[in-house]
Amino acid sequence: MKDIIIASFYKFIPLNDFESLREPILTKMHEIGIKGTIILAHEGVNGGFAGNREQMNVFYDYLRSDSRFADLHFKETYDNKNPFDKAKVKLRKEIVTMGVQKVDPSYNTGTYLSPEEWHQFIQDPNVILLDTRNDYEYELGTFKNAINPDIENFREFPDYVQRNLIDKKDKKIAMFCTGGIRCEKTTAYMKEQGFQHVYQLHDGILNYLESIPESESLWEGKCFVFDDRVAVDQKLDRVYPQLPQDYKYEREQK
């Protein structure tokens, strides 16, 4: 039985006091025994952390005790050991760095599709299926017929759109990422640019893998995750027990 719960979450919401939230959250993580990384910025909060069920429930309640976080949704996966080695709370300019100002995912994002809706939608040959992740993530696994933007980091995505998609504003574009947060920004950016039909996989690839039977799945390969599991398969089991050196630098920049 897998006793460790791994939770990922995010919320785009203005946090004028985000700097003052760091120490209380970090103190609570140490107090409970939670390990993981939480990122705070003016635009909101993003993170992943892990512990046993009792620890996680206590920390969920703590975070939700702030009225701004009362509706936080935690996406859970499970493992036999904690994939994080310590507790960290970081202050950043963005909770996921795209480097484009005046993009507000708190109100202007793509249309959410459930895993079941997504499964049907991306089989339409008229849909442009776009992987918003980095090139090494794409190489590990992606959806059948997905386009690889061939980017080394998320900051390069806007340039990809300007070079390759700007003349396709009337097309249906389906976008996906690991857990959903990058798609919040990419779809918001594209709507700001005038794209009319933008869709995103709700809660990302991990939600699809959990929801769609492997025998029917349109996912091919493994899914990279930003913790010491490195990647998971279609059953959400870890693929590599140790972290390859190739991915260390990217993880440390998160």
Swiss-Prot record:
Tell me any Pfam family this protein matches. Answer: UPF0176_N
Q: Where is the active site?
A: C177
| PROSITE patterns reported for this sequence | RHODANESE_3
Keywords assigned by UniProt? Oxidoreductase, tRNA processing
Gene Ontology process terms (BP): tRNA modification
Q: Does the keyword tRNA processing apply?
A: yes
Q: Which domain of life is it from?
A: Bacteria
Q: Where is the Rhodanese domain?
A: 123-217
Question: What family does this belong to?
Answer: Belongs to the TrhO family.
Q: What does this protein do?
A: Catalyzes oxygen-dependent 5-hydroxyuridine (ho5U) modification at position 34 in tRNAs.
What's the protein here called? tRNA uridine(34) hydroxylase
- Origin organism is Legionella pneumophila (strain Paris)
